[in-house]
């Protein structure tokens, strides 16, 4: 399954933001340890680099970007995706751009802490907890539950 990670999930992990860190870190681990393909829109790399360089340092920001490039699929974004994003009834343009990238790259879902912001998304959005609960149910042996 292809899943698009919202920027807030990665920031939860990178900045160890409580009370969100545990669930977001588990989502990231799950995505890396299973056959899921974790995706990230290209525009998120520059945002993450900027935030980490500002609040930590440039070396840590570079290390993070290198790690993301090695472990996640970075989805290219072009003009047509941004035009599509503008056509979506999503108030925040960054969220609309992420939804458009998810749609164009064949992602089946978006993982975000702000599900309400993605109600008009062409790709359904789930919280980390919802995703983990569904993933656990899928891996449960028959007769479990």
Residue ranges and their predicted role:
Residues 1-39, 53-60, 120, 132-145:
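Short, well-structured N-terminal submotif of metal-dependent ribonuclease cores
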Residues 2, 71, 100-145:
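Acidic, PIN/NYN-like endoribonuclease modules and their adjacent C-terminal/linker elements
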Residues 9, 44, 81, 97-98, ...:
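Alpha-helix capping/helix-boundary segments
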Residues 16, 42-44, 64-89:
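Acidic catalytic patch
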Residues 34-35, 71, 88, 121:
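Structured helix-beta-strand junction loops
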Residues 40-42, 112:
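Short beta-strand segments at enzyme active-site cores
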């Amino acid at each position: 399954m292809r899943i698009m990670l919202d920027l807030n999930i990665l920031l939860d992990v990178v900045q160890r933001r409580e009370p969100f860190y545990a669930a977001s870190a588990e989502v990231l681990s799950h995505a890396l340890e299973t056959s899921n393909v974790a995706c990230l829109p290209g525009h998120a790399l520059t945002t993450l680099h900027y935030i980490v360089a500002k609040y930590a340092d440039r070396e840590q920001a570079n290390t993070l970007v290198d790690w993301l490039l090695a472990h996640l699929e970075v989805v290219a974004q072009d003009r047509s995706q941004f035009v599509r994003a503008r056509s979506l009834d999503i108030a925040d343009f960054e969220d609309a751009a992420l939804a458009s990238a998810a749609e164009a790259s064949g992602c089946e879902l978006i993982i975000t802490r702000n599900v309400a912001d993605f109600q008009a998304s062409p790709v359904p959005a789930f919280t980390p907890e919802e995703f983990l609960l569904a993933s656990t149910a899928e891996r449960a042996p028959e007769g479990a539950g």
